[in-house]
Design a protein with these regions (language model features):
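Short helix-perturbing small/polar motifs within transmembrane alpha-helices
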Residues: 1-178
């Protein structure tokens, strides 16, 4: 059930598409998910990107997901790096930034595009931190049976991103997620 839930959350995060090609949500989600759920979250995120993005953007984000999954798996083997709290955020930033720079240099460089890609990677860094904090809070909740105030904020941020992905769904011209 948890694998299916991670797949669906990855699919929802991959379907968030802001400004027609600004979607770091699923890459941040995949880097924040714990080890055994990484593959299902990555497959869901890739499916979300394929269903909602154009070919070049979907390919760029899928390359970032693959890079993130490989780096997360490699760093899980190194005990010293495994304990670094910002590791998922750094991997998310690096994956988004490097794939964006590859697209930028292939299409021709412009200052505006560079800053858009830099802001996307920075947003991916922040979102990955929020997602990993929310997953840590859910892990603590399941082991101790309660949330702290900080954990409630982290889980609330995760839920708001999920609602953002559902904001395009309308029922009688009203969006329940909004």
């Amino acid at each position: 059930i948890a694998q299916m839930l991670c797949f669906l959350l990855g699919l929802l995060c991959g379907s968030i598409n802001e400004l027609n090609a600004f979607s770091p949500f699923a890459v941040a989600f995949v880097t924040a998910v714990s080890g055994k759920y990484t593959i299902s979250a990555g497959l869901g995120a890739a499916a979300g990107y394929i269903l909602t993005q154009d070919n070049l953007s979907a390919l760029r984000y899928i390359a970032a997901i693959i890079c993130s999954v490989i780096l997360i798996r490699l760093t899980n083997e190194l005990e010293r790096l495994k304990k670094f709290r910002l590791l998922p955020s750094c991997i998310s930033f690096m994956s988004l930034f490097l794939t964006s720079m590859a697209v930028l240099f292939a299409d021709g460089t412009s200052v505006r595009s560079f800053f858009i890609f830099l802001s996307e990677a920075t947003l991916g860094f922040a979102l990955s931190f929020v997602f990993s904090s929310a997953f840590d809070a859910l892990t603590v909740y399941s082991s101790q049976g309660g949330f702290t105030a900080r954990d409630i904020v982290n889980v609330g941020a995760l839920l708001s991103v999920v609602l953002l992905s559902l904001s395009e769904i309308t029922v009688f011209s009203a969006s329940p997620a909004r």
